[in-house]
Amino acid sequence: SMNTKIGDVWNSVPKEVDMQQHDWGVSEALRYRFTKELLGKASVSYDVRLPTDAELIGDGFLIAPSGDLKPERGTNANIGLMYDKKIGSGLLQVEVNGFFSYLQDMIRYTRNFVQGRYTNFGEMRTFGVEAEVKADVTRWLYGYVNATFQDLRDTRKYEPTSNVLNPSKGLRMPNIPYFLANAGVEFHKENLFGGKGQNVRLFTDASFVEEYFFDFEVSQYQEKRIPRSFKLDLGLEYSIMNGGLTFSAKASNLTNARLFSEFNYPPPGRAFTARIRYVLK
C-alpha cells in the first residue's frame, strides 16, 4: 500500500497517490545427489516483485516519480549441475546452470531530457546459461572463473496503449549485457612473516563485458552501442591479532580502462582505496 504525494520538475502542484495492491507468488525447488560429488538441482517459480521506493517516488532530482507502476510478474525455471571434489587439502567446484524467465510488466528505467523515470515496459523473455569453476590450486592459491550468456528478447506484440505493431518484437533487449565473464586469483598465507595470528591475502579480479546495444537494433546501421570493456582490480589485505586488526588496500580499474554503464555513462576511472578495521572483542 502507498499513501503519499508525488511531483516532478514540471508540476508545481503535487499529485496525491493512494493505492493498495495484493498479489501472490509460488515456488518449488528440488535437488538430487547422483553421486557423492555430483548434485543436480531444479526450480520453478511464479514471482511478484513490488516496485521499490526509489522506483515509485524517485529521488526528487534525476528520477521522476512513477506512482502508477505495476508489480513485475515473472515465470521462471532453473536447472543445474554442481560437481564438488576434494583435491588434496582443497576443493574443486564446477557448476553449470540454465535458466528461463518470462517477465510481464517489467520495470525499466527510461531516460528523458531532464529527468528519467521507471515505467512498466511490458513483456520480456530470457534464455541463458552460466558456468563457474572454483578451485584451491594449492593450500595457498585459490582461483575462479565464471561466464554468463543470456538472450533477452522483447516479446510485446503491440506498442504500449495502442494497436500499432511493435517494431522491436523479437529483438534483443538494450542496456543489458548478453555476455560477461569474471576471473580471479588469490594468494593467502598464514604467518607469512613469522609469529602467530597473522594472515596475508593478495588478490586480483578481472571482469569482461562484451559490446551490447544502447537501444533496440531496429536497423542494421544501428551504431548506438556500449563498447566492450575489461576491468582489472588488485588488492592486498594483512590482518594480525587473529583478525582483530586488518589493513587493506585496493586499486580498482588498475589499467584505467574506459568503462561505461548500461546507459553509456562513464564511471570513475582508476581509483585507490585503503582501510583499517579494528574488531572490538
Regions found by a protein language model. Give the residues of each.
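Transmembrane beta-strands of outer-membrane beta-barrel pores
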Residues: 1-4, 44-50, 57-59, 85, ...
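Short loop/turn motifs that connect adjacent beta-strands in outer-membrane beta-barrel proteins
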Residues: 37, 86-92, 140, 190-200, ...
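C-terminal beta-signal and adjacent terminal beta-strands/loops
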Residues: 48, 99, 143, 202-281
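Gram-negative outer-membrane beta-barrel transporters
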Residues: 94, 98-102, 119-213, 255
